[in-house]
Amino acid sequence: MGMRMMFTVFLLVVLATTVVSFTSDRASDGRKAAAKDKASDLVALTVKGCCSHPACSVNNPDICG
């Protein structure tokens, strides 16, 4: 294999590695966003549950308004 061919193969490997790394990183960002949405939904349900109980709503007027 010539020097030029080896350099071309090297560049192709670097490009392929970069593309795979970039796409997998973006996929993990999506999973993180989905987990964050689930957590905020859970917090909202917990607050709503607290506000429906008189004792809890009295102790947390800043949340239940």
Curated annotation (Swiss-Prot):
Disulfide bonds join C50-C56, C51-C64. GO terms for cellular component: extracellular region; host cell postsynaptic membrane. Residues 22-48 form a propeptide. Residues 52-54 are annotated as: Ser-Xaa-Pro motif, crucial for potent interaction with nAChR. The S52Dap (S4Dap) analog has potential as a candidate for drug development candidate to treat neuropathic pain. It is also much more selective for human alpha-9-alpha-10 than the native peptide (a9a10 (IC(50)=4.0 nM) > a3a2 (IC(50)=20.6 nM) > a7 (IC(50)=259.1 nM)). In addition, in a rat neuropathic pain model, it shows potent analgesic activity, superior to that of the native peptide. Expressed by the venom duct. InterPro entries: Conotoxin_a-typ. Keywords: Acetylcholine receptor inhibiting toxin, Amidation, Disulfide bond, Ion channel impairing toxin, Neurotoxin, Postsynaptic neurotoxin, Secreted, Signal, Toxin. Changing I63L: Increase in inhibitory activity towards human alpha-9-alpha-10 nAChR. Changing S57 to N/D/K/L/R/T/V/Y: Decrease in inhibitory activity towards human alpha-9-alpha-10 nAChR. Residues 1-21 form the signal peptide. The modification Cysteine amide is found at C64. GO terms for molecular function: acetylcholine receptor inhibitor activity; ion channel regulator activity; toxin activity. It is found in: Secreted. Belongs to the conotoxin A superfamily. The cysteine framework is I (CC-C-C). Alpha4/7 pattern. Negative results: does not or very weakly inhibit mouse muscle alpha-1-beta-1-gamma-delta/CHRNA1-CHRNB1-CHRNG-CHRND nAChRs. Does not or very weakly inhibit rat neuronal alpha-6/alpha-3-beta-4 (CHRNA6/CHRNA3-CHRNB4), alpha-3-beta-4/CHRNA3-CHRNB4, alpha-4-beta-2/CHRNA4-CHRNB2 and alpha-4-beta-4/CHRNA4-CHRNB4 nAChRs. Does not or weakly inhibit human alpha-1-beta-1-delta-epsilon/CHRNA1-CHRNB1-CHRND-CHRNE, alpha-4-beta-2/CHRNA4-CHRNB2, and alpha-7/CHRNA7 nAChRs. Alpha-conotoxins act on postsynaptic membranes, they bind to the nicotinic acetylcholine receptors (nAChR) and thus inhibit them. This toxin potently and reversibly inhibits alpha-9-alpha-10/CHRNA9-CHRNA10 (IC(50)=92 nM (human) and IC(50)=8.3 nM (rat)) and human alpha3-beta-2/CHRNA3-CHRNB2 nAChR (IC(50)=218.9 nM). Also moderately inhibits human alpha-3-beta-4/CHRNA3-CHRNB4 (60% inhibition at 1 uM), rat alpha-7/CHRNA7 (65% inhibition at 1 uM) and rat alpha-3-beta-2/CHRNA3-CHRNB2 nAChR (50-70% inhibition at 10 uM). In two rat pain models, this toxin shows analgesic effect. This is Alpha-conotoxin Mr1.1. It comes from Conus marmoreus.
